[in-house]
């Protein structure tokens, strides 16, 4: 492993600290808790939507969340290891066959729905 990769891994460990990042994929509905600073006040704002893209690039990993807010579609890009992210919670798993769901931008209503992935129980091997 080269020196830059080692430094990136150390920085990821330092930034995550005690936070645990859940595994999520495009199509999943997530709630991203974002630290917002307004003047001197600091609060946590929840941003819920569908992950339409995920970019795995080590320390530079990011993902795009799309939500419909009062009839308007809003997309926001988050850096995965950003200190502004307080936490990520997966609400539901989506069953999709694409890595990038950019086609959802041209759809609205029922055609923009994503099928839910049903979780199967693991068989016990004893």
Curated annotation (Swiss-Prot):
Q: Name one GO cellular component term.
A: cytosolic large ribosomal subunit
Q: Does the keyword Ribonucleoprotein apply?
A: yes
The record's GO molecular-function terms, alphabetically, read: structural constituent of ribosome
The answer, when asked if Repeat is one of the entry's keywords, is no
Task: Give UniProt keywords alphabetically.
Answer: Ribonucleoprotein, Ribosomal protein
> Which residues does UniProt call coiled coil?
none
**Family named by the database record:** Belongs to the bacterial ribosomal protein bL19 family.
Q: What does this protein do?
A: This protein is located at the 30S-50S ribosomal subunit interface and may play a role in the structure and function of the aminoacyl-tRNA binding site.
Q: What is this protein called?
A: Large ribosomal subunit protein bL19
Q: Which gene encodes it?
A: rplS
């Amino acid at each position: 492993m080269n020196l830059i990769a080692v430094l990136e891994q150390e920085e990821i460990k330092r930034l995550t600290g005690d936070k645990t990042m859940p595994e999520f994929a495009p199509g999943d509905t997530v709630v991203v808790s974002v630290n917002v600073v307004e003047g001197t006040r600091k609060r946590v704002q929840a941003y819920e939507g569908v992950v339409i893209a995920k970019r795995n690039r080590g320390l530079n990993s990011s993902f795009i969340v799309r939500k419909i807010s009062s009839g308007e579609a809003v997309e926001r890009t988050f850096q995965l290891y950003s200190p502004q992210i307080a936490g990520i919670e997966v609400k539901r798993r989506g069953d999709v066959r694409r890595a990038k769901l950019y086609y959802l931008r041209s759809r609205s209503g029922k055609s923009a729905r994503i099928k839910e992935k049903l979780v199967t129980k693991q068989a016990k091997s004893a």
